[in-house]
A protein has these predicted regions:
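Alpha-helical bundle segments that constitute or directly flank the non-heme di-iron/ferroxidase center
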Residues: 2-31, 93-117
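Amphipathic alpha-helices that form helix-helix packing interfaces
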Residues: 13, 20, 50, 57, ...
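Secondary-structure edge/capping motif, primarily at the C-terminal ends of alpha-helices
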Residues: 27-31, 58-61, 86, 113-117, ...
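Acidic (E/D-rich), amphipathic helical modules within compact regulatory domains
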Residues: 34-64
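Carboxylate-rich helix-loop segments that flank metal/cofactor sites and access channels
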Residues: 52, 59-88, 92-93, 100-106
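Preference for long, well-ordered alpha-helical segments
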Residues: 94-150
Length: 150
């Protein structure tokens, strides 16, 4: 196991969770719909919990915890588009944008899991558990989106 590579992989997931928290904070503020506000708050909480776990793992490896978001790249552009979308208050469009963001988060988890040889068993299990929770969130968003589009 390459410790520096482990730290980098864990920090990649911290950043995607930071992005997710910021995106859903924006969504929660901008949407007028109570059920979506609750959903977005819960998704923020999931990513905040993930971030804390990941940061602890980085610290145990004597690494420096990444605090930022990806100010460049696809995920940031998604959230900027998302903010513009939600100001129109179209439930289906909001949820469609959320699903896209969840896809990007899951892609990042898959990318890290593709390099599992650089992770301890403990960190691998944590990442798999976090990914499973994001998959649950994705399913919720997709279901609500499909209902809104009908």
């Amino acid at each position: 196991m390459d410790t520096q590579k482990s730290i980098t992989l864990l920090n990649d997931l911290i950043v995607i969770n930071n992005d997710r928290v910021e995106g859903y904070k924006t969504a929660e503020i901008e949407t007028p719909e109570t059920d979506l506000k609750i959903l977005f708050y819960d998704m923020q909480a999931t990513s905040e919990s993930n971030r804390i776990e990941l940061a602890s793992a980085v610290t145990k490896l004597n690494g420096e915890v990444e605090e930022g978001t990806r100010a460049t790249g696809k995920f940031f552009r998604f959230w900027m588009d998302f903010k513009a979308t939600i100001t129109g208050n179209n439930r289906g469009t909001i949820l469609d944008s959320c699903e896209y963001g969840e896809d990007k988060a899951l892609d990042e988890y898959e990318n890290v899991l593709d390099e599992k040889e650089h992770l301890s068993i403990e960190n691998l299990q944590m990442i798999q558990r976090q990914k499973a929770q994001i998959e649950v969130d994705h399913t919720k968003v997709k279901k609500l989106r499909d209902e809104a589009m009908d």
